[in-house]
């Protein structure tokens, strides 16, 4: 089979790496891809991933049998609809279904209508009304831009001033453009966050291994929010019982609700959860694999990813038996100095082969090739991943790989998986 992966980050490198392990994957293409993906796929850099017509044309030229969509923007832009119309199978939700991530107000209203546990909320299009509501509710409180904001449109305000500043930034200053013309304001939920991703064909739902992300830039969960500085799987807070509860109370009802609304959901559904005293509640839904969650979830998948994705596209997921490894995986992100704010690019990266020789996987997130050398080209540059029998061994192995890699201004968190390790110490 010929397979096309759309995207260029660490998530897409992981997807391509896993797909390449399937005996069914005869030829892999990536658009635009990255230098790491070039090990397993032919990268085609001159096609705009938001131009559906060009993507369909490329898929037809290369006789693509399956398209795998990484990022959210092409999904909300209807790339799966365009592929299906051309008779090409694609893994991912159609445009109407991707709205579950594309509009936070749609997602919250859906949960309210179908009784899916989430935080209390109100939706505002008027900044003044939003400010009045915040003054009435008080802090801590959560302010979210309604549309896609590259994972940066959520502000957890611990004080009233922070909350009012957030409304000013999102609505008055239009920091996220049109995405912030409407905001969702939510009650602050107390608890521990975890991510639960699931494969679905619109009827059957198969949860993946749980994971936990580290959003803050610096150790001790300090500093600004980022796209994610590291992850580990499984998350101890997601016990077997908790996964069962989340599947029955959240995942299954959400897929059923989407079908009922005439928006059947196929692909990967990502539930960002808060594990509260009352049980799991939805923080947000994403319409695709998480980044960097994918980097720890897929290395633990024992089954053939191509088979699973085809079953999701064909509506035959109930016939698949999906197996997971009992071990643990840890991903540590190496970022450019200054990230998530302004950073410099173009620094040569050393030690990639050394890290691989230590038994770690190195997924490229923000790299480019220049004069035959791999250089930095993004905020999050690499994800170094280790699998082992347990979390502690995976952490130790991952950091050995991280310490082998150098480039100017590189930084990483040194406490990835600290919550899991603290739980082990407490026992």
Where are these regions (language model features)?
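Solvent-exposed alpha-helices and their adjacent loops that cap or buttress functional pockets
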Residues: 21-23, 36-38, 61, 91, ...
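ATP-binding N-terminal substructure of ATP-dependent carboxylate-amine bond-forming enzymes
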Residues: 1-95
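Active-site "cap" helix and flanking loop/linker of ATP-utilizing ligase/carboxylase catalytic domains
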Residues: 247-269, 286-357
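Peripheral (often C-terminal) accessory segments that flank ATP-dependent C-N-forming ligase machineries
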Residues: 311-427
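Internal nucleotide-binding/catalytic subdomain
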Residues: 153-294
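Short acidic-hydrophobic, aromatic-tinged amphipathic segments that line or gate anion-handling sites
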Residues: 43-50, 122-126, 157
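A conserved helix-loop-beta module that forms one wall/lid of the active-site cleft
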Residues: 91-153
């Amino acid at each position: 089979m010929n397979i096309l992966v759309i995207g260029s980050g660490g998530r897409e490198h992981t997807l391509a790496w896993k797909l390449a392990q399937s005996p069914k994957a005869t030829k892999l293409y990536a658009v635009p891809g990255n230098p790491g993906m070039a090990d397993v796929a032919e990268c085609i850099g001159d096609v705009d991933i938001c131009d559906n017509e060009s993507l369909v044309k490329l898929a037809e030229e290369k006789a693509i049998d399956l398209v795998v969509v990484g990022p959210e923007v092409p999904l909300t832009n209807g790339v799966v609809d365009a592929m299906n119309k051309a008779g090409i199978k694609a893994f991912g939700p159609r445009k109407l279904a991707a709205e579950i991530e594309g509009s936070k107000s749609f997602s919250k209203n859906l949960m309210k209508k179908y009784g899916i546990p989430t935080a209390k909320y109100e939706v505002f299009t008027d900044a003044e009304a939003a400010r009045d509501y915040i003054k009435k509710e008080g802090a801590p409180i959560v302010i979210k831009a309604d549309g896609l904001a590259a994972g940066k449109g959520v502000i957890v305000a611990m004080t009233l001033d922070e909350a009012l500043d957030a409304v000013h930034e999102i609505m008055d200053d239009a920091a996220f453009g049109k995405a912030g013309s409407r905001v969702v304001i939510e009650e602050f939920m107390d608890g521990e966050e975890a991510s639960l991703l699931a494969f679905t064909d619109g009827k059957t739902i198969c949860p993946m291994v749980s994971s936990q992300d580290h959003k803050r830039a610096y150790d001790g969960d300090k500093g600004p929010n980022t796209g994610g500085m590291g992850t580990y799987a499984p998350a101890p807070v997601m016990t077997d019982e908790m996964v069962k509860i989340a599947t029955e109370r959240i995942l299954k009802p959400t897929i059923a609700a989407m079908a009922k609304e005439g928006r059947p959901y196929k692909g990967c559904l990502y539930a960002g959860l808060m594990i509260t005293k009352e049980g799991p509640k939805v923080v947000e839904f994403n319409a695709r694999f998480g980044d960097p969650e994918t980097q720890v979830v897929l290395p633990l998948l024992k089954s053939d990813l191509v088979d699973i994705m085809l079953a999701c596209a064909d509506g035959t997921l109930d016939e698949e038996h999906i197996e997971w490894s009992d071990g643990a995986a840890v991903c540590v992100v190496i970022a450019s100095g200054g990230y998530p704010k302004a950073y410099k690019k173009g620094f040569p990266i050393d030690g990639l082969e050394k890290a691989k020789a230590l038994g770690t996987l190195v997924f490229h997130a923000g790299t480019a090739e220049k004069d035959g050398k791999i250089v930095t080209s993004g905020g999050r540059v690499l994800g170094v991943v280790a699998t082992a029998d347990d979390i502690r061994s995976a952490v130790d192995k991952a950091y050995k790989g991280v310490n082998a890699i150098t480039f100017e201004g590189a930084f990483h968190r040194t406490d990835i998986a600290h919550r899991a390790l603290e739980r082990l110490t407490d026992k």
